[in-house]
Amino acid sequence: MDRNREAEMELRRGPSPTRAGRGHEVDGDKATCHTCCICGKSFPFQSSLSQHMRKHTGEKPYKCPYCDHRASQKGNLKIHIRSHRTGTLIQGHEPEAGEAPLGEMRASEGLDACASPTKSASACNRLLNGASQADGARVLNGASQADSGRVLLRSSKKGAEGSACAPGEAKAAVQCSFCKSQFERKKDLELHVHQAHKPFKCRLCSYATLREESLLSHIERDHITAQGPGSGEACVENGKPELSPGEFPCEVCGQAFSQTWFLKAHMKKHRGSFDHGCHICGRRFKEPWFLKNHMKAHGPKTGSKNRPKSELDPIATINNVVQEEVIVAGLSLYEVCAKCGNLFTNLDSLNAHNAIHRRVEASRTRAPAEEGAEGPSDTKQFFLQCLNLRPSAAGDSCPGTQAGRRVAELDPVNSYQAWQLATRGKVAEPAEYLKYGAWDEALAGDVAFDKDRREYVLVSQEKRKREQDAPAAQGPPRKRASGPGDPAPAGHLDPRSAARPNRRAAATTGQGKSSECFECGKIFRTYHQMVLHSRVHRRARRERDSDGDRAARARCGSLSEGDSASQPSSPGSACAAADSPGSGLADEAAEDSGEEGAPEPAPGGQPRRCCFSEEVTSTELSSGDQSHKMGDNASERDTGESKAGIAASVSILENSSRETSRRQEQHRFSMDLKMPAFHPKQEVPVPGDGVEFPSSTGAEGQTGHPAEKLSDLHNKEHSGGGKRALAPDLMPLDLSARSTRDDPSNKETASSLQAALVVHPCPYCSHKTYYPEVLWMHKRIWHRVSCNSVAPPWIQPNGYKSIRSNLVFLSRSGRTGPPPALGGKECQPLLLARFTRTQVPGGMPGSKSGSSPLGVVTKAASMPKNKESHSGGPCALWAPGPDGYRQTKPCHGQEPHGAATQGPLAKPRQEASSKPVPAPGGGGFSRSATPTPTVIARAGAQPSANSKPVEKFGVPPAGAGFAPTNKHSAPDSLKAKFSAQPQGPPPAKGEGGAPPLPPREPPSKAAQELRTLATCAAGSRGDAALQAQPGVAGAPPVLHSIKQEPVAEGHEKRLDILNIFKTYIPKDFATLYQGWGVSGPGLEHRGTLRTQARPGEFVCIECGKSFHQPGHLRAHMRAHSVVFESDGPRGSEVHTTSADAPKQGRDHSNTGTVQTVPLRKGT
């Protein structure tokens, strides 16, 4: 008895029964937070977690003594016992309602054990056998068939028990044990005790009280214990366990359970079975109701389904195509492999595919162990060499034959189509509202692969900020690997330049560029602190330059990324432009090309080579061009640093004038821009031809490079060190202009590769190219060949967009972004669709960048001379123009024509800024010029008698949509085109290398140009200043200062592939693709205008005019078939009537060769 009492007291003083029963699980667990491994809930104490785990395992160690009810927690059992006690009090002395089902209970176990003499006889006999009242209660419990662990309420009467102790005196008077009162009958004594004293005695011990609440508290505090399988002392009250332990043991941990469903629920913890998977995102759950709740996330949004949409709400677009809301739940048909990006239709095929990766990893681990093994014998090697074979081990080491390697076309990070599949078609972007040119720092850490969901997800900005706040000691591995304290590799002066990997490695570290210094690797909380810190490195570079360190740095090969000026992460911010001397267009191109290891041009024209850690080399350049150019451009770079305080926003990148220090970069870009967007290329220094770039903007004569064809560009490159040469059979075909196919070491390979390429010659001139699309662009722009009937196959058949996408609020709408490798620079939004071929006279002055494309530049009678200079003559040098685009500087032989053409164009250019002039509608690159609803009106609608034939036609856009714009208007260009020049021989005579205009050009093209000229004449008829234009060579210098544009760019520009791509950033070719869309020349506006017509109208495919009757359209089409006569050799002169173009005859009266022929209206 004493031992049982002491055990109960120990249980009360010690830890809770749950902790005592599971003491081996919590020993040494000092964690402040305890997390459930099933549902993820956290608890501050281990005991709370243990009680919570009973919900998952189903264990209920607490059992009610009156019924079969079980409870997992002690408090729940207390509530249950109180319900039994309340029922007992209501029923008075009758047996408790909960006792009826228990057959093993006897009379002594009720609250009224001594209610009758027959019942009390057996009970009292046991008490008389030499036991006290306290021990008698235990004997009663031990002799009964009830379980020893049960808790019972004992409401007995002291007087009844005292009187029952005399067996032979049943008829004698009974006495109350509390007040010593005597009663003749036992029922009277029981009534007295119940009414006067109400005693409540504990059956498990000698505790007795007059208050039932005290007895209940005593039982709950001392006698309620858990019946767990691992706690024998707590479960057994008097040495008799309730259940035989280990009926259903766990095979993993050995824990035993009383029921099978306890064991089944327990086994889920060991095998971690997620049997219920989501078919949309791939997440898996253990329980079906978890999956049911998860599926609500993929269902339609109930809140936004009935809510009216406002105009400010962004509309979901994918590539500027408005996506309608889909109410049905999406279904994913693909599973993405996290290692190689392959897509699979189900999870089984993905698991089978993952076995390949596991085998490859296992083979890599076995490879070092097998290195010590001997190779094949000499006889075997000789035999393999005779058969031109090699051992399989050597083949396995090649990356091209590795099993399960990453497929670039199926990689969701690099492939546009796979990115759309991996994102499940969701409207998402890698980063939110990327700045122009700052996509690579926003991309860092934005895309991650979620293993649970098996898809690529976007990392939130908050997570990136938390990662950026990490201490600098825990920085990214690439900065730790190339820190200042690391030993410098051989052949490099800068210890950071050799072991610096490409910037794509920063994407896995979660650290953005904005808070990390490229020079020393320090991490700052804000971007502004990093900018202030970068000035220290810039000051140090200036000191090194002043000490004459530039020659040594040039002799080292090139500047590394660390030696460059502090390149900010956002060229569009003011701080970026102020703190970076090269934060303009050239630096943005350097940022883009440096993504994959391409060189980055220095601000002073010094080329940089990106040195990879695995490609360390000690090769030095033998030429002295680097030091020569660095010495010549030192003052220019300092000047550029002082002038770089302008905010390098998008508009400034397009419209502001370029600094003098960037001219050599632009000349270098003229050779670099033919590289593929994401192709790593080797550094080639700028050719040291002694070319100088004067700071003046006049048309001084310069000795330029000889004209080159596309194949001649390879002769200008030098062999760049720092690249390991691949095996000849593994070297990929390099189609770039900067390839090394003409390297002396690769003469045999270069000759075979170059011979294998198909050369596409131009049928109208001597231009040749390896690319058919380049030839198509050349014929379209240079020779004005109409492509109405033959459109290139890569152009979309219909570029018409929904009118909803033209709304203003869609400018910042949510849209599905490109794959992360493109960095937010996929095909940019197409220009707004044009509703007609012209604009009203009110739409021109607002356009700052102009609307005349490159194809409409001034080409006077010297057009064949341009062709000759294109094929064999000296080319024009590229230099930055005042309007922000690269322009040409004329050579010696071309200066007279530039002077001759600049005179007639000076005054119209002046009036274009003060008076509205009709111009071709919205086609160029002017992002600010948006079509207004009034552009549907016809041009030249003023009531004049001489302009009636002109009103029937719209002015067609005469240029290609992928060329930069110029400030002068299209009518002035056309007037100069139709005019004759007094200087120089006739165009078709004496220019043997230039054929006449192509015969394939339909006569409708000349008709359109004539109508354009006539429209301009009708629109500016009353202008007296136009009629009194100055002479050819006598243009006043004031007019030249208004718009400083060398007009020679119009008729001296070589429109081959080199000149086409000169105006593009290396990776911003999306603008070129944009030109092949709605506003592109390949569509010829045929599909656009036809789709814009109302139902029942017939649209002319030549000019876009619509008619209600087909007969009217046929009559109108005869006007396009008019044949213009020419006077033989001067085939480029188009003759107009004096009634249609009276102003032109007066304007060009000094040329003297204009003939007019009446235009037959009936044809």
Curated annotation (Swiss-Prot):
InterPro entries: Krueppel_C2H2-ZF, Znf_C2H2_sf, Znf_C2H2_type. It is found in: Nucleus. GO terms for cellular component: nucleus. Residues 496-507, 840-857 have a biased composition (Low complexity). The keyword Translocase does not apply. There is a cross-link at K643, K681, K1043, K1062 (Glycyl lysine isopeptide (Lys-Gly) (interchain with G-Cter in SUMO2)). GO terms for biological process: adipose tissue development; brown fat cell differentiation; positive regulation of cold-induced thermogenesis; positive regulation of DNA-templated transcription; regulation of DNA-templated transcription; response to cold. Pfam families: zf-C2H2. SUPFAM superfamilies: beta-beta-alpha zinc fingers. A zinc finger (C2H2-type) spans 34-56, 62-84, 174-197, 200-223, 248-270, 276-298, 335-357, 515-537, 760-783, 1098-1120. Residues 1-13, 460-469, 542-552, 626-641, 656-667, 706-720 have a biased composition (Basic and acidic residues). GO terms for molecular function: cis-regulatory region sequence-specific DNA binding; DNA-binding transcription factor activity, RNA polymerase II-specific; DNA-binding transcription factor binding; RNA polymerase II cis-regulatory region sequence-specific DNA binding; zinc ion binding. Residues 588-598 have a biased composition (Acidic residues). Keywords: DNA-binding, Isopeptide bond, Metal-binding, Nucleus, Repeat, Transcription, Transcription regulation, Ubl conjugation, Zinc, Zinc-finger. Residues 1-26, 460-512, 533-667, 679-730, 838-1007, 1126-1163 are annotated as: Disordered. It comes from the Eukaryota. Gene3D superfamilies: Classic Zinc Finger. Residues 1-431 are annotated as: Mediates promoter DNA-binding and activation of transcription. Residues 561-572, 615-625 have a biased composition (Polar residues). Belongs to the krueppel C2H2-type zinc-finger protein family. Transcriptional regulator that binds to the promoter and activates the transcription of genes promoting brown adipose tissue (BAT) differentiation. Among brown adipose tissue-specific genes, binds the proximal region of the promoter of the UCP1 gene to activate its transcription and thereby regulate thermogenesis. May also play a role in the cellular response to replication stress. Interacts with PRDM16; the interaction is direct and may play a role in the transcription of brown adipose tissue-specific genes. Interacts with PWWP2B. Interacts with HDAC1; this interaction is enhanced in the presence of PWWP2B. This is Zinc finger protein 516. It comes from Homo sapiens (Human). The gene is ZNF516.
